[in-house]
Amino acid sequence: MALLVEKTTSGREYKVKDMSQADFGRLEIELAEVEMPGLMACRTEFGPSQPFKGAKITGSLHMTIQTAVLIETLTALGAEVRWCSCNIFSTQDHAAAAIARDSAAVFAWKGETLQEYWWCTERALDWGPGGGPDLIVDDGGDATLLIHEGVKAEEEFAKNGTIPDPNSTDNAEFQLVLTIIKESLKTDPLKYTKMKERLVGVSEETTTGVKRLYQMQANGTLLFPAINVNDSVTKSKFDNLYGCRHSLPDGLMRATDVMIAGKVALVAGYGDVGKGCAAALKQAGARVIVTEIDPICALQATMEGLQVLTLEDVVSDVDIFVTTTGNKDIIMVDHMRKMKNNAIVCNIGHFDNEIDMLGLETYPGVKRITIKPQTDRWVFPDTNSGIIVLAEGRLMNLGCATGHPSFVMSCSFTNQVIAQLELWNEKSSGKYEKKVYVLPKHLDEKVAALHLGKLGAKLTKLSKDQADYISVPVEGPYKPAHYRY
């Protein structure tokens, strides 16, 4: 696809695959709104006061139908928005088209190359001569990463004239990041520094991006305040757990039509995502094995009736492999060579480094047979047997299906709206330093409460005597910060 920004008749910039899908996207957005009571409640509560008036928000988060409802909630509250996806396969093109036509600048399409992906990220951050965004909604931390790497390069350039060398790294994706920064130095050697100075803060959606933020906080390089949305209970214990429980089997069946019942499935990692995946596979009739490094998570798995073994113990016996760790080098090419014919290998962690795709792609004589988009059979020459890899080792639930359903994403995205409001409303107060924060418990409980009515749930009310007896306010919060749900 030619990397040229287009404009709507109203002058809004965009780059999507097919604007003719906008009407279809609008119909699905309207369906999703009914399933997203938290976001709709935000529009009702905050819309009249327009709290985001004057705010420029950049989003780097999967451009799906559910995200479209988030974007239109931000614009309904007064924000200007520019958006890109945080994964090359996760965009739903009809959602991107509808938002580009009706609401916000969008730069996203399904099946981007890595070069196109980083071009889209750069466009979403580009607010013209006035600098960058005021706020960032990030998922995985790529928008945050680009700004941090850009500022670091600009400081080096100002200090000693050093220009980033893309060949200084073997990582093909990071080479593209350095190339973008190198080119920006030619036209504006303070581009990312000006972005940093304008930024009020970022709210981060997922485990992987949160890890990046805490690493930067620990080494003193975090450039602006950050709110960790992922560790809100109404995000991690719902989106990560119940969302994956729904979307993993959806992706598996759309990609392969395989019958899960009776199969041996291995889930690498038993955190919230792993728990949801293992539950889905078990409920579908698979015999589930878990791999874990953490004895507590391993013990939890055994108490759920799951086997806890090492990958090396069972690699030749497993039919379906799912990585959920957020780590790297979990399934290597030497493991893949030992797998049974047509074993399915997939990842539901954020990045593509859990599965050794580079080792697979460069294995001597290996043959790649594309069955359909994001479903490939790789045949090894020495065994003449193959494995099926989904979404090229990236997020299979969004690459091969449509990701988490609207209701559970409403929980996550309501947290995002509240986090963005918190950062924006406190921008001049000094409340938030260059650190990582978590939303307070009373807001977590508010997000949950906004979703109960849709499910027909009714809360029991504490009397004053009961509340005093357990030392909590009648209206909450009901649990201490250290409580484990």
Swiss-Prot record:
Per the record's keyword annotation, is RNA-binding included, yes or no? no
Keyword terms: Hydrolase, NAD, One-carbon metabolism
Q: Which cofactor does it need?
A: NAD(+)
State a GO cellular component annotated for this protein.
cytosol
In which residues is substrate bound? Answer: T64, D139, E205, K235, D239
Give the cofactor binding note.
Binds 1 NAD(+) per subunit.
Q: What are its GO biological-process terms?
A: one-carbon metabolic process; S-adenosylmethionine cycle
The Enzyme Commission number assigned here is: 3.13.2.1
* GO MF annotation: an example: adenosylhomocysteinase activity
Which residues are listed for NAD(+) binding in this entry? 206-208, 240, 269-274, 292, 327, 348-350, 397
Group of enzyme by EC:
hydrolase
Q: Which reaction does it catalyse?
A: S-adenosyl-L-homocysteine + H2O = L-homocysteine + adenosine
Report the InterPro entries cross-referenced here: Adenosylhomocyst_ase-like_sf, Adenosylhomocysteinase-like, Ado_hCys_hydrolase_NAD-bd, NAD(P)-bd_dom_sf, S-Ado-L-homoCys_hydrolase_CS
Q: In which pathway does it act?
A: Amino-acid biosynthesis; L-homocysteine biosynthesis; L-homocysteine from S-adenosyl-L-homocysteine: step 1/1
Family recorded in the similarity comment: Belongs to the adenosylhomocysteinase family.
Annotated function: Adenosylhomocysteine is a competitive inhibitor of S-adenosyl-L-methionine-dependent methyl transferase reactions; therefore adenosylhomocysteinase may play a key role in the control of methylations via regulation of the intracellular concentration of adenosylhomocysteine.
Q: What is this protein called?
A: Adenosylhomocysteinase
Which organism's genome codes for this protein? Nicotiana sylvestris
